[in-house]
Regions:
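Helix-loop junctions at membrane interfaces in 12-TM secondary transporters
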Residues: 183-192
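Helix-to-loop junctions at the C-terminal end of transmembrane segments
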Residues: 151-162, 246
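A late C-terminal transmembrane helix in Major Facilitator Superfamily
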Residues: 21, 30-31, 214-247
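Symmetry-related core transmembrane helices of the 12-TM Major Facilitator Superfamily/SLC fold
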Residues: 51-70, 251-269
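Flexible cytoplasmic inter-helical loops of multi-pass small-molecule transporters
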Residues: 73-90, 277
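Structural signature of the two symmetry-related core transmembrane helices
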Residues: 165-179
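Extracytoplasmic gate region of multi-pass secondary transporters
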Residues: 93-156, 238
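Intracellular juxtamembrane helix-capping segments at the cytosolic ends
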Residues: 1-11, 18, 202-215
């Protein structure tokens, strides 16, 4: 959240682009980590097994993060004031008292089942529906590619057509893909799953810009953190419900219902008044 809120302050006129580049890097990391960990489990050079993978990732991450944090800073206050077009500046406490917060957090929560109910079982699901193990692995790789593309492209599109229109389109696509995924077999499992990861990651990537559109830039990091709690709730509640109720095909029903509920939440979303009470 801190990196994305900082980027939005520097590029207030292109917030979607700024957060999309960051989100694209996050999405690509999924493909890298999948291949890296599988290679580490087979062993290469000094990297042997899962412990070796963690040591290697730590050695790569530490200098990169330290260097990045050394140069990361907010723009001058004068530039921030010129960039504040909507005049909204809600503290976290004020934001929590608006219905817009609960609609946004609810939409984020309802975006999760389409992917998170299936990501732990996608290899098993693919093989049950006619793919061999090698082909089923492509669902993970192409899912990561879809995630990176969604995180990069859709926030940029939202700069032009608006966050609400973008999210409505993504939830509608997620609803259609979730329905198709229920009956998909063979390579259509991979296609549908990659499309769902595109939509899910795109919805997550548009959220930081949507947050600052609604609630302002000054408290962007904390406000975004509160909105992201919806994702945490969804990522725990929906899998728990599916496991508790021993749902198999029911997972697809939860995903379809979640996409429909998310669409309804965004449809009901409108800008915050400048003097919320």
């Amino acid at each position: 959240p801190s990196i994305q809120s900082c980027a939005q302050k520097w590029y207030a006129g292109r917030k979607g682009l700024a957060t999309g580049v960051i989100g694209g890097a996050v999405g690509l990391s999924g493909a890298f980590l999948t291949l890296f960990v599988r290679a580490a489990l087979r062993g290469f050079g000094p990297v042997q097994g899962i412990r070796g993978a963690f040591w290697a990732l730590g050695a790569l991450t530490l200098p990169v993060c330290l260097a990045g944090s050394a140069v990361l800073s907010d723009p001058p206050q004068q530039k921030q004031r010129k960039s504040g077009k909507n005049g909204i500046d809600l503290s976290p406490g004020q934001m929590l008292r608006t219905k817009q917060y609960w609609l946004c957090a609810g939409a984020v929560c309802f975006s999760t089942p389409a992917v998170l109910l299936f990501s732990p079982i996608i290899l098993k699901l693919g093989m049950e529906r006619g793919l061999d193990e090698t082909a089923a692995l492509w669902s993970i790789v192409l899912g990561s590619v879809g995630s990176a593309a969604g995180r990069m492209l859709m926030p940029m599109l939202s700069d032009h057509i608006g966050r609400r229109a973008t999210d409505l389109g993504l939830f509608a696509a997620s609803l259609g893909l979730s329905t198709a995924f229920w009956a998909a077999r063979g390579w259509w499992v991979v296609v549908c799953y990659a499309g769902l990861t595109f939509c899910y990651s795109a919805l997550a990537a548009v959220l930081p810009a949507l947050s600052t559109d609604l609630f302002g830039l000054p408290h962007a990091g904390v406000n975004y953190g509160f909105l992201a709690l919806g994702q945490s709730v969804g990522s725990l509640a929906f899998p728990f419900a599916a496991n508790l109720l021993a749902l198999e095909n029911g997972r697809h029903l939860l995903a379809i219902a979640g996409a429909a509920a998310g669409f309804a939440a965004i449809w009901a979303l409108h800008p915050v008044r400048k003097d919320p009470r």
